């Protein structure tokens, strides 16, 4: 399953929208990343703190699983709690659990997309819980091909950024259309991560397959952001 990255202003707007499942964390979703800071209890955080002294917070992990059997979506929607199914709008059952807080999109083919995990372990645990729910409804569901497709992170550099200057100097990688989307879209090549950079200093990173790519991308962009700091 392919997950398109937000590389245009309209895609970025959709990505940051309140109703977006890809980035479901923003209280002021339209134009700025969340203020949430990294959980100091996360063992990964201290060892990933680079030159910037800032560690992006993981906001959403998107994973896919193959349950390896055909599913009757009407039956699932009828008997499972916190499940909705409106085939005219979307060809999957949308199911939610509270612990770990997440959302699953369950397709008749047996393919499942799980969103909302804040860590790789949470994502896998949630995916297993959904598979177990399907099994309890009488389907011969297995848990195969678990794969993390996208990791979304965010952080705040705590200083304003001159987006026009950044877009001009890094035109090959940047797209900035403030009348369509308030952030600059920066397409990093290595690691292959897309960054949404806001004038306030808030940053959203997406497209990573492993959390290290989020950290690497931020450390790579930080000197550039410092260069275009508004004084």
From Swiss-Prot:
UniProt-annotated location(s): Nucleus
GO MF term list: RNA polymerase I general transcription initiation factor activity; RNA polymerase II core promoter sequence-specific DNA binding; RNA polymerase II general transcription initiation factor activity; RNA polymerase III general transcription initiation factor activity; RNA polymerase III type 3 promoter sequence-specific DNA binding
InterPro entries in UniProt: TBP, TBP_CS, TBP_dom_sf, TBP_eukaryotic
Keywords: DNA-binding, Nucleus, Repeat, Transcription
Keyword Repeat on entry: yes
GO cellular component, one term: RNA polymerase I transcription regulator complex
Matches recorded under Gene3D superfamilies: TATA-Binding Protein
Alphabetized Pfam families for the sequence: TBP
Sequence repeats: 58-134, 148-225
One of the protein's GO biological processes: DNA-templated transcription initiation
Keyword Transcription on entry: yes
CDD domains: TBP_eukaryotes (cd04516)
Record's function text: General transcription factor that functions at the core of the DNA-binding multiprotein factor TFIID. Binding of TFIID to the TATA box is the initial transcriptional step of the pre-initiation complex (PIC), playing a role in the activation of eukaryotic genes transcribed by RNA polymerase II.
SUBUNIT field: Belongs to the TFIID complex together with the TBP-associated factors (TAFs). Binds DNA as monomer.
Family of this protein: Belongs to the TBP family.
Record-given protein name: TATA-box-binding protein
Organism: Schizosaccharomyces pombe (strain 972 / ATCC 24843) (Fission yeast)
Gene designation: tbp1
